[in-house]
Amino acid sequence: MDYLPLIQQLGYKELHSTQLIQSLWGGYGELVRVFADKTSIIVKHIALPETQNHPRGWNTTLSHQRKINSYQVELHWYQNFVPLLHKNCSAPLPLKIVEQEHTCLLAMQDLHQLGYVDTVKEANPMHLSACLKWLAWFHATHIQNPGDKLWESGTYWHIETRPDELEALLDPVLKKHAKQIDLKLKGAPFQTLVHGDAKLANFCFTADGKQAAAVDFQYVGKGCAMKDVALFMSSAVAPQQCTEKEQWILDTYFGHLREAIDSTQPKLSYSEVEKAWRPLFCIAWADFQRFVKGWSPSHWKINDYTEALTKQAIEAINKQA
């Protein structure tokens, strides 16, 4: 791909080099760092493939349409929401969007140029706290946001967009309760916007690890904040440490949430928000477990901790039925 015309449209004179960061999921393009003049930018090059190449074989028309929708949502998000984000939940600003029939270029700031120079595969407590702070401020500042033209239900595993995986689910108890779990999350008080894919790999950090910024907003939309917290913990805490770390993760998140609500939503009662959200952590994880067990039954994210949490969620739902 020749990125010279794009950088010229942005006012740069010289294209020095490009660096492939990663190919997009399922062969839908690439993420590239472009070095131009004395700086660098990030370009998300979305190219719709003629044949779909899903790593786990879910090559369906529905899967393809979901990805197309996700890129449309992401473009809308960058154009209309990112410029309004609070500094404590920052994301790269869009620089230019070029849409053609089967391709799209999303040029955005390079977080490296803004001081977010690190990504990590293993998070220390400082990294964990930085991500939880980002999520808390993101959730607090978007409580009751209508999420115009975003996903009606955020997250890439939402049940309405995953009928194939639900059909493949071999856990009869979880399958029976799947829609009740979803309805419980949809009915949660203080609905907000969720990132939708808040895994550790989608956060970049300052060199000291104290601040995080997030990327990859294909599945941003309305929902219960605990969905993001559960997905994040599933990606950032080893299964054998989850039981021990759960209380710390939740306390850290809610500590940041208190500060964020007090600062940005003075008309809301923090204690009411926490009272409504904290019990939904296990429900949100059970919702994710429903997807993973249908999608990839031998996945490492299915383990004793997640099974116990799912059981806890189903028991809670049955008590309230």
Give, region by region, the residue ranges found by the protein language model:
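Short acidic/His/Gly/Ser-rich catalytic and metal-binding motifs that mark active-site loops
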Residues: 50-55, 115-117, 223
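Active-site acidic catalytic loop and adjacent metal/ATP-binding pocket
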Residues: 27-36, 42, 181-227
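Conserved short submotifs of the Hanks-type protein kinase catalytic core
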Residues: 103-114
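Active-site activation/catalytic loop segments of kinase-like enzymes and analogous catalytic loops
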Residues: 63, 76, 222-263, 284-303
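ATP-dependent phospho-/nucleotidyl transfer catalytic cores
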Residues: 114-195, 204-207, 301
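Conserved NTP-binding catalytic cores of kinases and kinase-like/nucleotidyltransferase enzymes
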Residues: 1-101, 206-207
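Short, glycine/acidic-rich hinge or "gate" loops at secondary-structure transitions
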Residues: 94-98, 145-156, 264-271
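Helix-rich C-terminal or lid/interface subdomains of diverse kinases
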Residues: 129, 255-321
